[in-house]
């Protein structure tokens, strides 16, 4: 339904395939003159990545290498990649007053999901070193949340927002609990070194994240490749969100 709605706004080719099928991926680049790639495709459940690491390395890292290889070979000039703040692992702050993770922090992931994304970043950066026409923006997302606040039922454009199956993200689980679609919300861990003892996370609204990707395309017209954090620079604890 989303694809059908989008095609009413502007016609485009929708091709459904697995990025591991390199020859099929390459054929897309051969048959279309592509200037920009925005690469979202990935698995993203941290707990699952610990249990099934190879699933994440194959899908997230190897498949990213496939699309980077094709993009560089067939003249793509702008490559936007959705990475994750999980690449930072457990950051060490220099002082109690410092609570913001910046791009200068060491990338030291602590799970296969974060590792698979960091390895993908290296694939992109290494290719850019040998192909000066291949520019990239890497976005390290913090916790993406929310839904399009301007959406109206029956609108021509599709609604964007959180939709996971199974649902594991905090804000949707809280909302479902409030709507009595769940019995309760469970807090895991109340002994963190934070004011209320619960984990603090930075968030970013889906609308702002979408805008960031458009800005990245424009950015690469005049600037060199770079990596950016995608968050608001301040966090909220689990109890604060509730």
Give a label for each model feature:
Residues 1, 170-242:
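C-terminal substrate-binding subdomain of Rossmann-fold SDR/epimerase-dehydratase oxidoreductases
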Residues 55-57, 99, 110-118, 160-172, ...:
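Short-chain dehydrogenase/reductase
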Residues 1-147:
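N-terminal Rossmann-like NAD(P)+-binding domain of SDR-like oxidoreductases, especially those catalyzing
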Residues 11, 42, 93, 99, ...:
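Short, functionally important structural connectors and interaction interfaces within domains
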Residues 2, 92-94, 148-159, 199-200, ...:
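Short aromatic-enriched loop/helix-cap "lid" or pocket-rim segments at secondary-structure transitions
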Residues 7, 51, 59, 131, ...:
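A generic fold-level signal
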Residues 148-168, 176-177, 183:
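Hydrophobic, Gly/Ser/Ala-rich alpha-helical and linker tracts in large acyl-processing enzymes
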Residues 91, 116, 148, 191, ...:
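Gly/Ser/Thr-rich beta-alpha loop segments that engage phosphate groups in nucleotides
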């Amino acid at each position: 339904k989303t694809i059908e709605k989008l095609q009413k706004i502007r016609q485009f080719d929708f091709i459904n395939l697995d990025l591991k099928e390199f020859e099929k991926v390459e054929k897309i680049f051969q048959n279309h003159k592509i200037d920009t790639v925005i690469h979202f495709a990935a698995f993203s459940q941290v707990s699952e990545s610990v249990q099934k690491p190879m699933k994440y390395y194959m899908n997230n890292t190897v498949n990213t290498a496939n699309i980077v290889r094709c993009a560089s070979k067939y003249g793509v000039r702008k490559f936007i990649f959705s990475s994750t703040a999980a690449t930072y692992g457990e950051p060490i702050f220099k002082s109690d007053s410092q609570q913001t993770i910046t791009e200068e922090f060491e990338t030291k992931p602590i799970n296969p999901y974060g590792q698979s994304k960091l390895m993908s970043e290296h694939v992109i950066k290494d290719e850019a070193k040998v192909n000066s026409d291949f520019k990239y923006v890497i976005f390290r997302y913090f916790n993406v949340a929310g839904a399009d606040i301007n959406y109206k039922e029956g609108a021509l454009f599709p609604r964007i927002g959180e939709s996971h199956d199974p649902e594991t993200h905090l804000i949707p689980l809280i909302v479902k609990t409030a709507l009595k679609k769940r019995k309760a919300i469970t807090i895991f861990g109340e002994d963190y070194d934070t004011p209320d003892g619960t984990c603090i996370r930075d968030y970013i609204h889906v609308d702002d994240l979408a805008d960031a990707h458009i800005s990245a395309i424009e950015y690469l017209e005049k600037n060199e490749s770079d990596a950016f954090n995608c968050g608001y620079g301040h966090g909220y604890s689990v109890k604060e969100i509730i």
